[in-house]
Amino acid sequence: MSDSMKWKKLGQIITPNKINRNWMITHAMDPTVDHIEGDIFRVYFCGRNNNNQSLIGYADIDINDPQKIIKTPENPILGLGSLGSFDDNGVTASCIVTHKNQKLLYYIGWKPRSTTRFGLMTGLAISNDKGETFKRFSKAPILKLTDREPYSILTAPFVLKDNNDWKMWYVSCEGWEHSDLPKYNIKLATSSDGFEWKQDGIICLNFKNEKETAIARPCVLKEKGIYRMWLSYKNLDQNYRIGYAESEDGINWIRMDDIVGIDVSENWLGLRK
């Protein structure tokens, strides 16, 4: 079991007023980090345009001076899908993996609904130029609706190459309490190549009590044979918090939220719903 963690908040790094781009009029959300070289890291994230639609761009930073942005693209590296597709109203970065000289960007596609607030499905885009531009692997989501997973929230994946296997922990909707309140937990999918995925509907992290309504945005490391997951969770009484869990097999997890070492602030850091 890991010891208690302690995090120091350094404040805002990427904001719309620091980056003057038409794809980033408002918002800088859902950071997804890739190590470039040395102390340089690329933070993929989404801004929102004048139509309040999320588009994916990036900012390169030096980890020793993260307030200074080295580079951002003039245009988004991934825009909206074609009209009527699962990602025609927004795209959000979720995980980036380097594989055979390619960058695989697993992303969230946003789709407005009529009877429920939205659909969120998982897409894949590929870069052959070290992450400067991306092309969709498919116009369809790479996770599929099934009888065990019939709701259109299969999303926010984290992908880990684990020896010869690929593992994906992702958000899966268990149902809607009403049109604006989905309930979702974390499930596991597996793959031999990172492109085609097998969904068994295995619940890895479920709600810890009746009030908890969401477990989301998993991020997983494997150290000394132990899988370590940072996650987000919320319940009916509070907004999102960061949680933590550990597993020996990647399937059965023990929640250890009390040792995560970070909580909400009184300023902007505590406002995310």
Residue ranges: model-predicted function:
Residues 1-273:
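Carbohydrate-active catalytic/glycan-binding domains of CAZyme proteins
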